[in-house]
UniProtKB/Swiss-Prot annotation:
Its EC number is 6.3.1.2. Keywords: ATP-binding, Cytoplasm, Ligase, Nucleotide-binding. Residues 19-99 form the GS beta-grasp domain. Residues 106-357 form the GS catalytic domain. This is Glutamine synthetase root isozyme 1. Belongs to the glutamine synthetase family. The gene is GLN6. One of its GO terms (cellular component) is cytoplasm. One of its GO terms (biological process) is glutamine biosynthetic process. PANTHER family: GLUTAMINE SYNTHETASE (PTHR20852), GLUTAMINE SYNTHETASE CYTOSOLIC ISOZYME 1-2 (PTHR20852:SF109). It is found in: Cytoplasm.
C-alpha cells in the first residue's frame, strides 16, 4: 500500500496532461499570502494561457460579505518545487468584478510605472536583500534562543557556522534550492547579525519581475517553514534592545547608471530620493520606526544621508561604483515587511519620472 509520502510525491506526468496551478495572491493585511490550487490542461508556458479565478474576499479582509467576490488575474508563473513535474506556482493580482484593482493590489500601479516608455528605456535593475527571522512555533521566540531568555551578544552569528551560532540552516538551504528550481533569480543567502535571523537575495531582476520574484520567494519560504513547524517573521524589529532589526535593502541601477558617467546620474537620483525622504519612508514598511534608529547599521528615520561604504546611511554607494564611475546604489531604508511592488515602483518613479521639483 502506498504511504502518504508516496502519494504526495506521485508523478502524474505519465497518466494525464492535467497539471496543478497554485494561484497565489496578497491578502488583506498587505503582507499575508494566500493561495489555492486548480487543475488546468498543461503544459503552461505563459500566464496568458491561464484563466482568471475568484475567491471570497470577505474571508481575507478585502471585500464585504454582501459582495465578496474578488477576481484573480494571473501575472507570472514559476515551477512548483513542492509538486514538481509540470505543476506551477502562479503569482496573481486582485481586481473587483468590474476590473478595478482593489486597494491592496500594489502591483497594478507598479506595472504602470514600469511600462512607461521613459522607465522601460532605462531597464531598471533591482537586487533585493530580504531579511527574516525564524521563530519557535509555540512561543514566538527566535529559533535557537532559550525560551524566555537570550543568547550571547551579537558578534559571533553573522555568516557563522556551528550548532551554537547558526539556527535553521536546513530551512534556509531548502528555500535556496526550491527558489532556484522555481526559476526565481535568487542570488545568495547568509546568516544575519542577530541569531535566528537570515537573509536571501533576489536579483538582478528587471522592473516588475523583482516584485513578483520576492513575493513568490516569500511564499515558498512560508511553505517550507510550515513543513518544518517553524514560524516566519518579517517584523522589522522582532526583538527589542541591542539586537539588529530586519530590512529589505534594495539595490538599484538604471541603464544610464551602468554606463560611462553613471556616477553623476547616481548622485542626481540620490538627491531626488532625499527630497522625497518622508514619502518613501511612509511607504517602506510598517513598524520601520522601531528599526531605523541610527543604531544597528541603520540611519535615523528622520534623517536622510548617503555615503560610500556607509552602512549607517540611508543610501549606500559601493566602493566599486565610486572607483569605476558607474554602477548601482543601495537604498537601506525599506523594512523586511515592505511591499516590493511599492518600493521598486516608487524608486523608479522618483528617480526617472519625477523632475525633482
Amino acid at each position: 500500500m502506498a504511504s502518504l509520502t508516496d502519494l504526495v510525491n506521485l508523478d502524474l506526468s505519465d497518466c494525464t496532461d492535467r497539471i496543478i496551478a497554485e494561484y497565489i495572491w496578497i491578502g488583506g493585511t498587505g503582507i499575508d499570502l494566500r493561495s489555492k490550487a486548480r487543475t488546468v490542461k498543461g503544459p503552461i508556458t505563459d500566464p496568458i494561457q491561464l484563466p482568471k479565478w475568484n475567491y471570497d474576499g470577505s474571508s481575507t479582509g478585502q471585500a464585504p460579505g454582501e459582495d465578496s467576490e474578488v477576481i484573480l488575474y494571473p501575472q507570472a508563473i514559476f515551477k512548483d518545487p513542492f509538486r514538481k513535474g509540470n505543476h506551477i506556482l502562479v503569482m496573481c493580482d486582485c481586481y473587483t468584478p468590474q476590473g478595478e484593482p482593489i486597494p491592496t493590489n500594489k502591483r497594478y500601479s507598479a506595472a504602470k510605472v514600469f511600462s512607461h516608455p521613459d522607465v522601460a528605456a532605462e531597464v531598471p535593475w533591482y537586487g533585493i536583500e530580504q531579511e527574516y527571522t525564524l521563530l519557535q512555533k509555540d512561543v514566538s521566540w527566535p529559533l535557537g534562543w532559550p525560551v524566555g531568555g537570550y543568547p550571547g551578544p551579537q558578534g559571533p552569528y553573522y555568516c557563522a557556522a556551528g550548532a551554537d551560532k547558526a539556527f535553521g540552516r536546513d530551512v534556509v538551504d531548502a528555500h535556496y534550492k526550491a527558489c532556484l528550481y522555481a526559476g526565481i533569480n535568487i542570488s545568495g543567502i547568509n546568516g544575519e547579525v542577530m541569531p535566528g535571523q537570515w537573509e536571501f537575495q533576489v536579483g538582478p531582476s528587471v522592473g516588475i519581475s523583482a516584485g513578483d520574484e520576492i513575493w513568490v520567494a516569500r511564499y515558498i519560504l512560508e511553505r517550507i517553514t510550515e513543513m518544518a513547524g517553524i514560524v516566519l517573521s518579517l517584523d522589522p524589529k522582532p526583538i527589542k534592545g541591542d539586537w539588529n532589526g530586519a530590512g529589505a535593502h534594495t539595490n538599484y541601477s538604471t541603464k544610464s547608471m551602468r554606463e560611462a558617467g553613471g556616477y553623476e546620474v547616481i548622485k542626481a537620483a540620490i538627491d531626488k530620493l532625499g527630497k522625497r525622504h518622508k514619502e518613501h519612508i511612509a511607504a517602506y514598511g510598517e513598524g520601520n520606526e522601531r528599526r531605523l534608529t541610527g543604531r544597528h547599521e541603520t540611519a535615523d528615520i528622520n534623517t536622510f544621508k548617503w555615503g560610500v561604504a556607509n552602512r549607517g546611511a540611508s543610501i549606500r554607494v559601493g566602493r566599486d561604483t565610486e572607483r569605476e564611475g558607474k554602477g548601482y546604489f543601495e537604498d537601506r531604508r525599506p523594512a523586511s515587511n515592505m511591499d516590493p511592488y511599492v518600493v521598486t515602483g516608487m524608486i523608479a518613479e522618483t528617480t526617472i519620472l519625477w523632475n525633482g521639483n
